[in-house]
Every structure is written in structure tokens, then in C-alpha cells.
Swiss-Prot record:
GO molecular function, one term: RNA binding
Gene Ontology BP terms: maturation of LSU-rRNA from tricistronic rRNA transcript (SSU-rRNA, 5.8S rRNA, LSU-rRNA); translation
Keyword Ribosomal protein: yes
Subunit note: Part of the 50S ribosomal subunit.
Protein name: Large ribosomal subunit protein uL30
Superkingdom: Archaea
Family classification: Belongs to the universal ribosomal protein uL30 family.
The entry's keywords: Ribonucleoprotein, Ribosomal protein
């Protein structure tokens, strides 16, 4: 199984330097509460380190992956259903999730089929810390390991 990283943008665009905005657009995270799924890779890790004060990320488990894939959209407001996945990719929905988990399909390469990035809601109950502090210091941004799945559960 390839290790997958869930990345969520938690801060907006105001007073963001151009090189941070450029990197966030390469990661397809143009607005706050947008999310993407990437394989764990050194190039992705370098971009995440550059924009770490604007995003939070961590390793996805099966539940977090399933929740994020369930929030995929065909177009604005239209959710992906099993018939759409069967029609476009010729696999059922469970096989689609398994192929993403195994690394056979890369979700970030399927932008002609799905409307990317994945749009999420603000977390239920609010953020537990300040958005302007790193996660390990009691804040919200930066690397959070497997605790990203708890945040995804609250944002879906």
C-alpha cells in the first residue's frame, strides 16, 4: 500500500506572498478548506514544507480516505455516485477507493473526470487551537500525522 497524504488548506489568501500562492495553486489548494490527496513523495513534501503555515497535512487511514473520496464532485454541487464511477472508470466505487489506496490511481491526475479540489466545511466545533500556531505547539497548521483523520471527520 502506498502511503497517502491528506492536505487541507486552513488559511485564506489575504497577505499571502506570491511564492506561497503559487505553490498552493500547484497543490490545487486555492481556497480555505480545500483538500487534496497525494502520494507521499519528496517533491510533495518539499512543497508542503514551504506552505506549512497555510495548510495542515498527515497520513490518511482507510476511514479518512473513504470520507474524502465521498466528498468528490462531478461539478459544483453534484456529488460523485457509484453509477458515475462505473460509467467513467469501469469499476465499482469500492474498487475505486481501493485502487487509490494501492496507488494504481492518483486522484490528483483525474481532474478531467472529477471537479478538484475536494471542498470541505469548516470543522464542527471549530478549530481546537489557533490557526496561526503550529500543530505541535497547540495550534492547527503544519504536520499532524494520523490526527488528520479526526479533522477530516469533523469537516465532512
Amino acid at each position: 500500500m502506498n502511503e497517502l497524504i491528506g492536505v487541507i488548506r486552513i488559511r485564506g489568501w489575504a497577505a499571502t506572498p506570491w511564492y506561497i500562492q503559487d505553490t498552493l495553486s500547484m497543490l490545487r489548494l486555492k481556497n480555505a478548506f480545500n483538500a487534496m490527496i497525494y502520494p507521499k513523495d519528496s517533491s510533495i513534501q518539499g512543497m508542503l514544507n514551504l506552505v506549512s503555515s497555510y495548510v495542515t497535512w498527515g497520513e490518511l487511514n482507510d476511514e479518512g480516505l473513504r470520507l474524502l473520496v465521498s466528498k468528490l464532485e462531478i461539478s459544483r454541487g453534484k456529488k460523485v455516485n457509484e453509477e458515475y464511477v462505473k460509467d467513467k472508470l469501469n469499476v465499482d466505487f469500492q474498487s475505486f477507493v481501493e485502487s487509490i489506496k494501492d496507488g494504481k490511481l492518483r486522484l490528483n491526475k483525474l481532474d478531467e473526470i472529477f471537479s478538484l479540489p475536494i471542498r470541505l466545511h469548516p470543522p464542527k466545533g471549530g478549530f481546537k487551537g489557533k490557526v496561526s500556531r503550529p500543530f505541535r505547539a497547540g495550534g492547527e497548521f503544519g504536520y499532524r500525522g494520523d490526527k488528520i483523520n479526526e479533522l477530516i471527520r469533523r469537516m465532512v
